[in-house]
């Protein structure tokens, strides 16, 4: 009898996938290390966004996964991809563009093909798309450093 093993995407949030162990910059590319599996959790709710955020001297870069289409960088936007964005004082996205590429491997999240000199802060977060106001805002910060 032939058995086939099927591996499904993780359907539950594992917060260790967003707990920051270390962060820095190599050759102008910001990176962070998590305690769990980088990119191991992806949102199952169409209005949610999971994000690894890098605040740099050249803007804020965000490696994110979500169910709605907003980039040509990846075929399916639940795949981790990078945007450069601006948040307002309510932590809502006011400007977003495709800038930078993404490397997610084991416990590492890295933004590539950008030039930054320093990373002043990193944080991991959940954002939510509000269809009524057409806004996407941070609803939960999982972890931050420093």
Residue ranges and their predicted role:
Residues 29-33, 110-112, 126:
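Beta-strand secondary-structure signal
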């Amino acid at each position: 009898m032939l058995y086939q093993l099927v591996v499904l995407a993780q359907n539950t949030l594992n917060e260790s996938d967003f707990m920051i162990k270390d962060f820095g910059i190599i050759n102008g590319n910001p990176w962070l290390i998590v305690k769990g599996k980088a990119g191991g959790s992806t949102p199952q709710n169409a209005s949610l966004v999971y994000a690894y955020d890098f605040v740099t001297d050249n803007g804020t870069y965000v490696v994110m996964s979500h169910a709605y289409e907003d980039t040509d960088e990846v075929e399916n936007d639940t795949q981790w991809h990078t945007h450069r964005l601006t948040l307002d004082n309510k932590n809502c996205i006011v400007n977003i563009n495709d800038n930078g590429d993404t490397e997610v491997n084991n416990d590492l999240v890295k933004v590539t093909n950008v030039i930054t000199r320093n990373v002043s802060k990193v944080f991991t977060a959940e954002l939510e798309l509000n269809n009524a106001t057409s806004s996407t805002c941070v609803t939960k910060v999982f972890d931050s450093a420093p």
